[in-house]
Structures are given as structure tokens and as C-alpha cells.
Amino acid sequence: MATYVILSSFTDQGIRNVKDSPDRLIAFKAAAEKLGVAIKHAYYTVGAHDIVVVAEGAGEAITAALLKLGTLGNIRTTSMRAYSPDEMKGILKKLA
């Protein structure tokens, strides 16, 4: 399973309904799980992004989960593939 870091920012709609955000996060975790995505960590943050999520799953499953989340109109996301130190060692060995 691949690891992804997902940076989320509230839309105007999302911030108007911010009190519902914890319940929406619980619902997202359940929906993501049905798609084969495990939400490992979720943090509310202050700064450029409002929520940071660490998820594991196949790339297509992550994409499906984020597209489904986006259709609700409460947040916008940016995702990044993340590599563990061991995964990076394996990648770097291929450079030789």
C-alpha cells in the first residue's frame, strides 16, 4: 500500500459549516475504508491548510476517495505520495 499526505483547505461552504467538520471527517474515514483506503492519521491544523491526513491505499483508491470527498464541496485537497526511508533506499538503488 502506498502512503499519501493529503493537505486540505476549507471552502467557503466548509468554513460556514465548520462545526460539522469532525462528523464529516468520521464519514470520510468510513467512505475511504469502503474504497480500500486506510486513514492512518488526521490532524486539524492552523496555517495554510486546515486538515492534514495521512492515508494508505492504492493510487486509484486514494483518487476515488478524494474525488468523492471533493463532490461534497466542503474542502479542496492537494495530495502527495510519501515514501518511507526504506522505500526511498529501494528507489535510490535503481539509480545505479
Where are these regions (language model features)?
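A compositional/biophysical signature of low hydrophobicity enriched in polar/charged and small residues
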Residues: 1-96
